[in-house]
């Protein structure tokens, strides 16, 4: 559900809000883990979208690694295990790291708290 729409809400605002909602859901899921992740990697089609990668970094308040040649990751991971070279992935694969922007992360932290309070109410709507 979209909350807070007004006549000035543009299509781009709604698209961004959809991405933010997914990012908030990912954060909610990650908060259920027993331990915080040390690394977060993103692969697939969404990893090609800079805005999505940055939204994730800001919402999760954690760097996001994006590997340019993700298709070889399984083979590199296997070789890393077989040859006992733990840092092989970092030395073989080109990686872009999206760092959280502290100001944006604070804004998203406030929005995430609102998301957590609204989500239970909206979830019951049919």
Predicted segment positions?
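Glycine/Thr-rich phosphate-binding loops that ligate phosphate moieties of nucleotide
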Residues: 1-126
């Amino acid at each position: 559900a979209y909350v807070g729409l007004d006549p000035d809400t543009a299509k781009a605002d709604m698209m961004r809000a959809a991405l933010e909602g997914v990012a908030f859901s990912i954060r909610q899921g990650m908060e259920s883990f027993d331990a915080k992740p040390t690394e977060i990697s993103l692969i697939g089609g969404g990893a090609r979208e800079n805005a999505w990668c940055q939204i994730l970094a800001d919402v999760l308040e954690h760097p996001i690694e994006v590997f340019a040649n993700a298709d070889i990751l399984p083979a590199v991971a296997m070789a890393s295990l077989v040859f006992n070279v733990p840092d092989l992935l970092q030395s073989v694969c080109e990686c872009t790291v999206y760092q959280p922007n502290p100001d944006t992360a604070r804004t998203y932290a406030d929005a995430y708290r609102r998301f957590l309070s609204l989500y239970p109410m909206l979830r019951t709507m049919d």
